[in-house]
A protein has these predicted regions:
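Conserved alpha/beta-domain cores
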Residues: 1-152, 160, 172
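Divalent-metal-activated hydrolytic enzyme cores
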Residues: 163-164
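Alpha/beta catalytic cores of nucleotide-metabolism and tRNA/nucleoside-modifying enzymes
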Residues: 128, 167-178
């Protein structure tokens, strides 16, 4: 869907891929995407780097952390995050194999619930993870963006430290999935 829109729109637009990204779909967006919000595996990072290299680009990425109680949501747990950051850091220093991606932050989605105390707890947990790792820095790793909060909970997310919110439904209305 994004590729169809990209072909019709001005080429100076910065495109963000929001949502779960399948590894086999990266090749379709690597030519133009500026930021991929939902990177949830080391394998996906490798594929983004591979496809970005083909286009001589650097693609910014947010690592998605699983903070919700819902199992249907994607994301890394804290151990997987730490493994990626260690592997990424060592890959950077050893052979700079990830020169076509830059990890610029973390993102997470809270549980879909009316319980604001639970949502706040999940947002604060992600903020603590972000703060714990925000001092890490290499040529392609610097956590500057904390993306949490959507149209229904963005104000709470901002109060918990979010630096980027996803509020497309508030601006454009609900999506029509056909």
């Amino acid at each position: 869907e994004m590729t169809e829109k990209w072909e019709q729109m001005p080429k100076d637009i910065e495109w963000h891929m929001i949502g779960h990204v399948q590894t086999n779909k990266v090749k379709f967006m690597a030519e133009y995407v500026s930021l991929i919000h939902g990177v949830d595996s080391f394998k996906l990072l490798e594929e983004i780097n591979k496809q970005a290299k083909k286009h001589n680009r650097i693609i910014d990425c947010l690592l998605q952390i699983h903070i919700a109680e819902e199992e249907t949501k994607f994301g890394l747990n804290e151990e997987e995050l730490e493994d990626i950051l260690k592997n990424f850091d060592s890959a950077q220093s050893d052979n700079n194999s990830f020169k076509n991606i830059k990890i610029v932050g973390l993102m997470g989605m809270a549980t879909f619930t009316e319980n604001t105390a639970q949502i706040e707890k999940e947002f604060k947990h992600l903020k603590a993870i972000f703060d714990k790792h925000s001092q890490l820095e290499t040529s392609n790793l610097k956590l500057q963006t904390l993306s949490m909060g959507m149209s229904g909970d963005y104000q709470l997310a901002i109060s918990c430290g979010s630096t980027m919110v996803r509020i497309g439904s508030s601006i454009f209305g609900n999506r029509n999935y056909q």
